[in-house]
């Protein structure tokens, strides 16, 4: 209370007792602090060795606290939800989003298929999408459209809300087509974000003939 703004500019906090090292935001409870042990997806973690030799702080220093990595993290992997709740990327999100970003830079070589980013339930998939979209828009030139396709209305709503809460899109932006006709209209426009359920791509071939070409653009990113 004596220095209420002491942590206003703080980006990340690291806690360590030598045996265990965790990363988190200053306003988060300890249960939301997490390990950072991998510098790449290929790293194999020997937890017994790390614990026995008190190496967790060294792993943090060699990976996240590397100058280039830390600058990238601060620039692209910190979000604010509803202006007040700070959300920072976990180890798997940082590595996964950057793998997608690197693949996206090679999209022509990869025939437009930039990969699969697998998440377990509750591991922050919608925030990973936000971080990926923000980094692409911030670091790359282009007029990209991000098309987020889901198969459940609750999931579509959740992802859309997280994009709104982190101010990537506005609450009143028209980004969720109500039906197939509006979806096709959205895809013919230059909307930056579109959130849709997969069934809205449905088409009655008997009544309407062959499926139409929805867009000739090569800068639509499907997630």
PLM feature spans:
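Short, surface-exposed, polar/charged, turn-prone segments marking secondary-structure boundaries
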Residues: 40-44, 174-178, 221
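Generic enzyme active-site microenvironment
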Residues: 15, 149, 223
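Conserved RecA-like ASCE ATPase "motif II neighborhood" in helicase/translocase motors
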Residues: 192-223
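Short alpha-helical segments and helix-capping/turn motifs at coil-helix boundaries
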Residues: 1-2, 178-182, 205-209
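Conserved nucleic-acid-binding Ia/Ib motif block in the N-terminal RecA-like helicase ATPase lobe
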Residues: 147, 153-194
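Conserved long hydrophobic alpha-helices within structured protein cores
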Residues: 91-99, 189-198
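ATP-dependent helicase/translocase motor core
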Residues: 1-145, 154, 158-170, 217
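A short beta-strand-to-loop transition that corresponds to the Sensor-1 phosphate-sensing loop
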Residues: 17-19, 152, 196-200
């Amino acid at each position: 209370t004596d220095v209420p703004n002491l942590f206003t500019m703080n980006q990340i906090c690291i806690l360590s007792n030598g045996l265990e090292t965790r990363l988190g935001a200053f306003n988060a409870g300890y249960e939301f602090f997490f390990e950072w042990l991998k510098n790449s997806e290929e790293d194999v973690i020997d937890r017994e060795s790390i614990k026995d030799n008190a190496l967790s702080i060294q792993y943090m220093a060699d990976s996240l606290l590397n100058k280039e990595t830390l600058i990238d993290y601060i620039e692209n992997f910190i979000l604010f939800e509803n202006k007040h709740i700070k959300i920072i990327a976990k180890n798997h999100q940082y590595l996964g989003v950057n793998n997608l970003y690197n693949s996206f830079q090679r999209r022509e070589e990869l025939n437009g298929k930039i990969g699969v980013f697998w998440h377990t339930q509750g591991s922050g998939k919608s925030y990973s999408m936000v971080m990926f979209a923000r980094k692409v828009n911030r670091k790359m030139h282009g007029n990209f459209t991000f098309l987020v396709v889901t198969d459940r209305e609750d999931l579509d709503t959740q992802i859309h809300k997280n994009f709104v809460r982190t101010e990537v899109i506005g609450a009143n932006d028209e980004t969720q087509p109500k039906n197939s006709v509006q979806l096709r209209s959205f895809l013919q426009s230059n909307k930056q974000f579109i959130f849709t359920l997969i069934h809205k791509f449905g088409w009655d071939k008997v009544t309407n003939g062959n499926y139409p070409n929805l867009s000739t653009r090569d800068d639509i990113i499907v997630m």
